[in-house]
Amino acid sequence: MSDIEERVKKIIIEQLGVKEEEVKSEASFVDDLGADSLDTVELVMALEEEFDTEIPDEEAEKITTVQSAIDYVNAHKDA
């Protein structure tokens, strides 16, 4: 597991109050991890803070699964 993947999963666990084993790559924040719209906004804010980046709203709407969050950070970490 990459450092970024570990950091993203740690944020998801902290923000959503879920168990580590529930945080699978394909897990949907809403459908699988029980997040609501406020949870997803807070999750995006935590990702922005952790990775010192700004995620535009139109991009944030596409971050709906654990893997999509990891992919977004990987794609934008050097931007």
From Swiss-Prot:
4'-phosphopantetheine is transferred from CoA to a specific serine of apo-ACP by AcpS. This modification is essential for activity because fatty acids are bound in thioester linkage to the sulfhydryl of the prosthetic group. SUPFAM superfamilies: ACP-like (SSF47336). One of its GO terms (molecular function) is acyl binding. Pathway: Lipid metabolism; fatty acid biosynthesis. The gene is acpP. It comes from Pseudoalteromonas atlantica (strain T6c / ATCC BAA-1087). Residues 2-77 form the Carrier domain. One of its GO terms (cellular component) is membrane. Keywords: Cytoplasm, Fatty acid biosynthesis, Fatty acid metabolism, Lipid biosynthesis, Lipid metabolism, Phosphopantetheine, Phosphoprotein. It comes from the Bacteria. The modification O-(pantetheine 4'-phosphoryl)serine is found at residue 37. This is Acyl carrier protein. One of its GO terms (biological process) is lipid A biosynthetic process. It is found in: Cytoplasm. Its main location: cytoplasm. Belongs to the acyl carrier protein (ACP) family. Carrier of the growing fatty acid chain in fatty acid biosynthesis.
